[in-house]
Amino acid sequence: MAINIRKTHPLLKIMNHALVDLPAPSNISLWWNFGSLLGLCLIIQILTGLFLAMHYTADISMAFSSVVHICRDVNYGWLIRNIHANGASLFFICIYLHIARGLYYGSYLYKETWNIGVILLFLLMATAFVGYVLPWGQMSFWGATVITNLLSAFPYIGDILVQWIWGGFSVDNATLTRFFAFHFLLPFLILALTVIHLLFLHETGSNNPLGINSNADKISFHPYFSYKDLLGFFIMIFFLATLALFMPNLLGDAENFIPANPLVTPPHIKPEWYFLFAYAILRSIPNKLGGVLALLFSIFILMLVPLLHTSKQRSTIFRPMTQIFFWLLVANFLILTWIGGQPVEQPFMMVGQIASISYFALFLIIMPFAGWCENKILSLN
């Protein structure tokens, strides 16, 4: 009998267990496609970023011009840049949908996998933030100034911390150089953590829409889910191509077409759309330190979700009460995203404050209480 090399070769064996002979639940829906889509996004971002880095100059006198040079003079530079800029937006769309799937179907009960996922989200946000500074436009400069300045809210060490990150007394050449270094380094750290994320996931196996043990009904990953993922790849590449070729500046800020000028402040300083929900939470608290802590907690609250799970059932598929609150959370997230892009005036401030309170209340009080109530209703039957 012929020896199957993919099952015996030390390297191919690892790949085989992860991508070919991996036992997967037979009933996982399209919501389970986003993990592989995130992997594709990461590969696209690393490759396009590598080619951009070959032509980019991390110097405040040349950064803006080098980006213009990439778009005008480099062969298909405009395309590489548009794919990289819009690929970041698609990356965040996929990760938010991936997290929403995890919350809806109770995947967060795989605590190690979930917590590494939250760290991955934080690293992705850090990478996107430092990357947004690199073109050295008006919003790049002022975004960097405002967001890094938030660290000065920490008592005693705040001001020293800000100057240490800036590499001086203002956002200057040293800041841009180190941000470029971080932007180059962090995706590889994300790649390494993704491998660990998968390692922990394959220890337990995937969850499924019913939230029950599916060991009795598993099928091999290839060909069933590899082709299913491939369909997702084509759909995502179609959306990315449409965005990059027809509407490349749809999700950007017009202010960033103006070279950075420390003497002129833009009328509305706001980050990219994928940070707006956290930015709205930050702005809704009048105290600077309180705002910064709320901003951090708005992301790290996800780490508390496994501890706040009170229901006897894992998935929300048979829990209509929790389902309502889940969709309220989704609506709340969208409202916060909208508010984050609006000027700081009434009625936006009030709506932002109500949405911020609702955001934390849904995670910390309402959804755990709904789970407890559902347990009581079940015990009555």
From Swiss-Prot:
Membrane-crossing residue ranges in chain numbering: 34-54, 78-99, 114-134, 179-199, 227-247, 289-309, 321-341, 348-368
Keywords assigned: Electron transport, Heme, Iron, Membrane, Metal-binding, Mitochondrion, Mitochondrion inner membrane, Respiratory chain, Transmembrane, Transmembrane helix, Transport, Ubiquinone
CDD domains: cytochrome_b_C, Cytochrome_b_N
Keyword Secreted attributed: no
Pfam families (UniProt xref): Cytochrom_B_C (PF00032), Cytochrome_B (PF00033)
Keyword Iron: yes
Assigned GO CC terms: mitochondrial inner membrane; respiratory chain complex III
Coiled coil: none
Binding site for heme b b562: H84, H183
GO molecular function: metal ion binding; ubiquinol-cytochrome-c reductase activity
List of residues binding heme b b566: H98, H197
Compartments where found: Mitochondrion inner membrane
Binding site for a ubiquinone: H202
PANTHER family hit by this protein: CYTOCHROME B
Family note: Belongs to the cytochrome b family.
Protein name (database record): Cytochrome b
The encoding gene: mt-cyb
